């Protein structure tokens, strides 16, 4: 009986998908951060995953300072979901709507409160278009946002804006991104996908 109980508990714990804690390094202004290792998010029980590569630069959640006093800031229980969302907004393999919905799913799986999920979703849904278009413009200009391994040891006193300019001068470009990866279809809903 005890063995069955332990197996059930293990199954419950492992079935609660969460995004692993990222290992990041800040740039000098602590506005932008770089992933020191890949982060892979298994989306619900779908069997599909999003991997944000080592070297990706994120600002976590782009929440205006005016909202920080209301308990929302760039860093919170939604930070891991924000990294996934930043990557989806940068790579643009999914539509903006799909990226926003995957953010909701990731926040739900991270245990973010319903009120916070709703507030952040409203922000990206209504106000994220400028970031989406800005990212497209930067990608069209072939600006990098994924730092190759050989450039990950940057000085502690450099900002992302400064370091990015150095990378551009050296001809660093992002890898090609997959168009319409299989996980995008999960963004046609805001519900955590079940098995199958």
Q: At which residue positions do the language-model features occur?
A:
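Extended terminal accessory/targeting regions
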Residues: 16-196
